[in-house]
Amino acid sequence: MNIQSDGIRIDLVTGSRRISNLGWASVLLLGTSGFLLTGLSSYLGKDLIPFLYPSEEHMKIAFAPQGLVMCFYGIAGLFLSTYLWCAILWNVGGGYNEFDRQEGTITIFRWGFPGQNRRIRIRCLIKDVKAVRIETQTGLLSRNDISILLRDKQRLVFNQLGDSLTLQEIEDKAVQLAQFLQVPLEGV
């Protein structure tokens, strides 16, 4: 989502709060809970998931090899699921890109994990911007990047991970950004 007025342009960045991340975290939580409950059922000798397993004796799982491995996978998956849910809750990677012609600054803000560097803010001057650049890579892992080249040879990448934009959409965004910053466009 873009917000633009006369001298300010703000591009909002989604971060971890994506539908795909919510789906993966939910599936992982449910799946690993099933693994853990199955392993604990084999250890306790009781059906903790009675609607899933029939009460026949030949369907019981021995704890020694299978139940232990199921518990291990369940615990490991719960840790991974907790990590994903925390990243979603804290909106890691979310933030904004602000281009302010009135003050002459570019601000990149992202949320990180809690701690000393929770707020990540990078500021630079618009007068230090040399050009807006489009970089394309084709092949198995193809990607299109919009970046800003600074005079000191640094490169700031602005497109989001997970954005599946066509080359035309990437070019349109880059042209709009170059026009707003009043700098040349490279790599078209």
UniProtKB/Swiss-Prot annotation:
Location relative to the cell: Plastid, Chloroplast thylakoid membrane
TM stretches of this protein: 22-42, 68-88
InterPro entries: PSI_Ycf4_assembly
Keywords for the protein's UniProt record, in alphabetical order: Chloroplast, Membrane, Photosynthesis, Plastid, Thylakoid, Transmembrane, Transmembrane helix
GO BP, sorted A to Z: photosynthesis
Record's bilayer topology term: Multi-pass membrane protein
One Pfam assignment: Ycf4
Cellular component, GO annotation: chloroplast thylakoid membrane; photosystem I
Entry-linked HAMAP family: Ycf4
Family: Belongs to the Ycf4 family.
General function of this protein: Seems to be required for the assembly of the photosystem I complex.
Protein name, as recorded: Photosystem I assembly protein Ycf4
Species in which this protein is naturally found: Zygnema circumcarinatum
